[in-house]
Amino acid sequence: MCEYCLIHEEDTFFGLEVDHIIAEKHGGETKLENLCCACLTCNRYKGSDIATLDKETRALVRLFDPRFDVWAAHFELEGASIVGKTKVGEATVRLLKLNLEERLLERGILQSLGRYQGNQE
């Protein structure tokens, strides 16, 4: 399962990729504690980013870290939308474009088929 948007590998055309949570160019190592599974779309939008600017304050906000953060503490599912509950969640939703129209459509279809429930924690 993608550790950012929670889509299952079997429901993606391209499967999952291994993402360096902290990119090597930022000093991240290729160790299990710095690697996670990501769908192609999340991984492409995240790229080597580890933070982004807050939309309102322009302060630097780190991105969600699947190894140290709990998904349900930073995000919630409202229909097919993934909503950030914290600054980290909001920044991650925005940077990874988790609520693009086509992503909402995909999650909505999967929900109607009982194949996407988000995080059940």
Per-range role (PLM):
Residues M1, H26-E29:
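Short, charged surface segments at domain edges that flank catalytic/cofactor-binding sites
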